Amino acid sequence: MSVSLSRLERQLGYTFKDQELMVLALTHRSFAGRNNERLEFLGDAILNFVAGEALFERFPQAREGQLSRLRARLVKGETLALLARGFDLGEYLRLGSGELKSGGFRRESILADALEALIGAIYLDAGMEAARERVLAWLTTEFDSLTLVDTNKDPKTRLQEFLQSRACELPRYEVVDIQGEPHCRTFFVECEINLLNEKSRGQGVSRRIAEQVAAAAALIALGVENGHE
């Protein structure tokens, strides 16, 4: 193992028994050979479970939708990339030449994906308890800053934060119809996001309200919220 990877292990607070797992977790798909996408998939599932379990215990009075919104804040790409930068993770990534030249080692989505891959690698290396311990340790500051007040956000904000947590494009809203007299109009809005095959729709007495209704419908269609809070 190189000295540099030993340094990264100290920053992560974890020493790998199988160092090939660590190297694989740091290997982007632009690099020749095997890459970290499967580990990222596994790490994403573990991260969501550990965060959800911790929130379930920490906020016993919270409703399902509130817990989902808190978790989205914890696991969003911005949060993960910030943690990754704290570990100087970009210095250790294995990137293809094109990705390296374009500054991929600084890109939020690549950093967040690599951190999730490391979570998956730790799980395979030492099991669930080791992965849980590292996730909770890394997210201590974020956990401590959460309150249920954080869930009192409008649907558009909640949808945006959820999509950012998945490194997805932001939603696009379009007014498709306006009905009624000038003093009593009804606006019809469609919300388009890449994760859904169909557009979500909303209507209201203003464009702003119609957009909020469409965003709420999108959250339900995504399974993030159940619409029964």
Curated annotation (Swiss-Prot):
Instruction: Reply yes or no: does the keyword tRNA processing apply.
Output: yes
Gene that this polypeptide is encoded by: rnc
Entry similarity comment: Belongs to the ribonuclease III family.
Single GO BP term: tRNA processing
Top-rank lineage group of the source organism: Bacteria
What PROSITE patterns does the entry give? DS_RBD, RNASE_3_1, RNASE_3_2
Reaction(s) catalyzed by this protein? Endonucleolytic cleavage to 5'-phosphomonoester
What organism is the protein native to? Pseudomonas syringae pv. syringae (strain B728a)
The cross-references to SMART domains, in alphabetical order and at most eight, read: DSRM, RIBOc
- Name its cellular compartments: Cytoplasm
Q: Which InterPro entries match?
A: dsRBD_dom (IPR014720), RNase_III (IPR011907), RNase_III_dom (IPR000999), RNase_III_sf (IPR036389)
Q: What is the lineage of its organism?
A: Bacteria, Pseudomonadati, Pseudomonadota, Gammaproteobacteria, Pseudomonadales
Q: Domain RNase III spans what residues?
A: 5-127
Stated name of the protein = Ribonuclease 3
Name a GO CC annotation attached to this entry: cytoplasm
Query: What are the UniProt keywords, alphabetically?
Result: Cytoplasm, Endonuclease, Hydrolase, Magnesium, Metal-binding, mRNA processing, Nuclease, RNA-binding, rRNA processing, rRNA-binding, tRNA processing
Q: Where is the DRBM domain?
A: 154-224
Q: How does it assemble?
A: Homodimer.
Q: Tell me, what does this protein do in biology?
A: Digests double-stranded RNA. Involved in the processing of primary rRNA transcript to yield the immediate precursors to the large and small rRNAs (23S and 16S). Processes some mRNAs, and tRNAs when they are encoded in the rRNA operon. Processes pre-crRNA and tracrRNA of type II CRISPR loci if present in the organism.
Say if the entry is tagged with keyword tRNA processing: yes
EC number(s)? 3.1.26.3
Where this protein primarily resides, as one coarse class? cytoplasm
Where, by residue number, does Mg(2+) bind? 40, 113, 116
Any idea which residues are catalytic in this one? 44, 116
A GO molecular function annotation here is: rRNA binding
Names of the cofactor(s): Mg(2+)
Q: Which Pfam families match?
A: dsrm (PF00035), Ribonucleas_3_3 (PF14622)
